[in-house]
Amino acid sequence: AIAIQGYILAKSLASCGIPVRVTSFCSLRGYTVLRILKDFGDKNGERNVFNYFAAGWNRDGLALRGAGELIKSAPAEKHLLILLTDASPDDSHKILPSGKVPLSRDYDGQIGVDDTAEEVRALRAQGIRVAAVFMGENASVPAANAIYGRDLARIRRIDQLAATAGRLIQDEIRELSS
């Protein structure tokens, strides 16, 4: 169902002449893997979105940092990064000790939310618009708001993804155009 909705979005944007990259991410055995399902130059690459599958954990902050690096090769001046999220960053591998924090810590809860929000702020500081479609538990609403602020839309069912993301994209394009 996620792949179908992602396909609809990617196909619609490409049909409007908007360059589209579709990427998924997960963390497996200590590695955060970004998988490009459809890249900007892929002619009719939207079908590759059907290769999406959910797996592993999600270290959102690191994935966003990687997405920011990938955006540097994008063909447009202005960029919009839209995520489908449950606003519950979580990883099986701990955060390593640093000078400020001498003990390792779990990557979950408030620590994961803070890390993800920091990466969203960093992307926005680079001029990248970041928005999210949130599909998660009521308990995760405060985390979603803390991470994405006003650039957030909530859905309750996956079949609402394409329409909701479409409205979010329209809002973001209006902002980018002004």
What are the functions of these language-model segments?
Residues 1-178:
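Acidic, glycine-rich A-domain
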